[in-house]
Amino acid sequence: MAEKVYIYDTTLRDGSQMEGVSFSLEDKIRIAEKLDDFGIHYIEGGWPYANPKDNLFFQKAKKMNFKNAKLTAFGSTRRPNKKVSEDPQVESLIKAETPVVTIFGKSWDLHVTDALKTTLEENLNMIYETVEYLKRYVDEVIFDAEHFFDGYKSNPEYALQVLEAALKGGADWVVLCDTNGGTLPHEIYEITKKVKERFKDANVGIHAHNDSETAVANSLMAVLAGARQVHGTINGIGERTGNANLCSIIPNLQLKLGFDVIPQENLKKLTELANFVAEIINMPLPRNMPYVGESAFAHKGGVHASAVLKNAKTYEHINPELVGNKRKITVSDLAGRSNLVHKLKEFGIEIDPKSPELKKLIDKIKELEKEGYHFEAAEASLELLIKRHFGLVKDYFDFDAYRVLIAKRRDDSLPTSEATVRLSVEGVEEHTASLGNGPISALDRALRKALEEFYPNLKELQLIDYKVRIINESAGTSAKVRVLIESTDGKRKWGTVGVSENVIEASWIALRDSIVYKLMKDEEEGIL
């Protein structure tokens, strides 16, 4: 039977310390529910004493029914030279009424003398007394040995005495923290092994930060050395360069090292979970993130794609479906017939690989990419291009003209933008105008306003991202630009692209494709 490794998620506390991340109370509740559903064992909800929002979260969480996770409150040891029962910070941990409390304490002698301004002996007393006191009120106490690896390298005997004080106080887990993120994997392994040799029966955990970009490797090495609890965050979010990324650690432990981590069927929810958290914090998931990124199983080169389609093991380390991701064969100027044949099948088009039509399509795509088009992030435009080539996209409207005006008067703080659009649907003409925050916003609003009377479903459409890139910078103000637009209707997301020497025209092309793609998909589903 596989050995168990317990996952301790600190997204709601350590993750919130990342620059640009701020969780609302509702965000925290939604993420906690998602983590529990996924099968996480411990969810660190926050620090009730330091943050009023965390206090509210723990009050709300009392009414939540966790089926897999133990909710955990986070805090610190008592203050120096103070009775533990009189420390309001410690009392706040008890009032949180969680089954588990995690406290951190100093394990680096430098921090004890220079940061805490107390003696090494008093620090040991603080740890022992706080753990012992909390054990009277909660089921489980986890002790985070802050800066443990730096402390061990500075004064190994004292760092071990810190763990001993926590264990004597009744700590259920002692967690070795690489707080500054500067320890390398071989050091993590050696030091964790020494800890396990010294405290054979102790439950040991690892808490790694990613400052040296080794947090995932450090976590795995600690487990190989005997640690059985791993701390981290979804997508590796956290202070400075982040925490250990649970989206890599969990599949590595379960699929590669054979540990029992979460229910196997839940592993398929990993990509969904990663995207959910990315959406909540409004930070796009990096395309190249291992296991869960959009490009994690993407194949661009023709040789690679051809081999993968014959046998996926040739260029994939796991089946992407195991983590809820999917294989992606991209079409680009590097792509060959295999890529395009596969993509056509995805779009429901069967074609002979030797067909002259396929050659024409490849040539067309390569010519467009030479002009500056880029379809890897704009699969909706690619699907429309292919289906138009085969006459499979109907004309949802006939475009006549658009005009965009930008005006600023002397007394205006900001310019105003107005767009007019003239088009017809099945012979019925429509001429509309709209204002916007900028020219593209105005054009988008005018186009949708003209079409919504005929296609009410377009009210669901939202533009969620807009990027402009100069393709040939040396041309200065005459440079060609590529516009990428990401859209959603609440059910799906898609990307479209436009290229022109005029940014308004490039945006129009991408906007038009976004709307046509939405209408085409709705018609395919019978809801237009």
UniProtKB/Swiss-Prot annotation:
Q: Which Pfam families match?
A: HCS_D2, HMGL-like, LeuA_dimer
Its recorded reaction(s) are: pyruvate + acetyl-CoA + H2O = (3R)-citramalate + CoA + H(+)
GO terms (BP aspect):
isoleucine biosynthetic process; L-leucine biosynthetic process
Q: In which pathway does it act?
A: Amino-acid biosynthesis; L-isoleucine biosynthesis; 2-oxobutanoate from pyruvate: step 1/3
Broadest EC class?
transferase
Q: Does the record carry Cell membrane as a key word?
A: no
Q: Where is the Pyruvate carboxyltransferase domain?
A: 5-271
Keyword terms = Amino-acid biosynthesis, Branched-chain amino acid biosynthesis, Isoleucine biosynthesis, Transferase
Could you say which EC number(s) this protein's record lists? 2.3.3.21
Q: Which GO terms describe its molecular function?
A: (R)-citramalate synthase activity; 2-isopropylmalate synthase activity
Q: What is the recorded function of this protein according to its Swiss-Prot or TrEMBL entry?
A: Catalyzes the condensation of pyruvate and acetyl-coenzyme A to form (R)-citramalate.
The family classification in the record reads:
Belongs to the alpha-IPM synthase/homocitrate synthase family.
Q: What is this protein called?
A: (R)-citramalate synthase
In its UniProt entry, the species of origin is given as: Aquifex aeolicus (strain VF5)
